[in-house]
């Protein structure tokens, strides 16, 4: 895919985000788009966000469960960039109707690092050594793709369907909790909506972070 089209699609997704409008799936438009093309589109979208004054504060790993991978026909996760415009503190109101289009909520685990991880060759032990703490996180994903009709290239291009997220207020050392068996409950007004465990994410959330570091290492990014 040539750079002109990549920039046009990245600009289109950025404008969709700003104007809170959806676009037709990129994969339905009759041209070939690879996952690598999609990452370049997401970087163009990120360039527009940074030019508007946002700054990168972290990264998001998506498509970590076997169920979602099977749905999208892939065998690996994807990633996107988190900016300071996306984060909210525990107890702080989120202006969802003002910022998002078709939100969905998910429970996550956030890793706060005390030093960069640069792949390839990053191991689980490296991840634990580099982690200051882990924090429960409430992610509200969003898609600029119409009706969430996404293939893997669509969600990758759309910054891994990043929306907003809330960091919890209880931080613990990753060595003080079993991240594989650690469970999470998502409730709404006291009603249980979903449950999950760390093992559902590539066998362990630590595996996810190692995957991300090693994947980014191929691009020279820590």
Swiss-Prot record:
Pathway as given in its UniProt record: Aromatic compound metabolism; benzoate degradation via hydroxylation
EC number from the UniProt entry: 4.2.-.-
UniProt-listed GO biological process terms: benzoate catabolic process via hydroxylation
UniProt keywords, alphabetically: Aromatic hydrocarbons catabolism, Lyase, Plasmid
Uppermost EC category: lyase
KW Nucleotide-binding (keyword) present: no
One cellular component term from this protein's GO annotations in UniProt: cytoplasm
InterPro entries to which the protein is assigned, alphabetical: Fumarylacetoacetase-like_C (IPR011234), Fumarylacetoacetase_C_sf (IPR036663), Hydratase-Decarb/MhpD_sf (IPR050772)
Database matches in Gene3D superfamilies: Fumarylacetoacetase-like, C-terminal domain
UniProt GO molecular function: 2-oxopent-4-enoate hydratase activity
Keyword set includes Lyase: yes
Biological role: Conversion of 2-hydroxypent-2,4-dienoate into 4-hydroxy-2-oxopentanoate.
Family label: Belongs to the hydratase/decarboxylase family.
PANTHER family assigned to the protein according to its UniProt record, in alphabetical order: 2-KETO-4-PENTENOATE HYDRATASE, ACID HYDRATASE
Name recorded for this polypeptide: 2-hydroxypent-2,4-dienoate hydratase
Species assigned in the record: Pseudomonas putida
Record lineage: Bacteria, Pseudomonadati, Pseudomonadota, Gammaproteobacteria, Pseudomonadales
Gene: xylJ
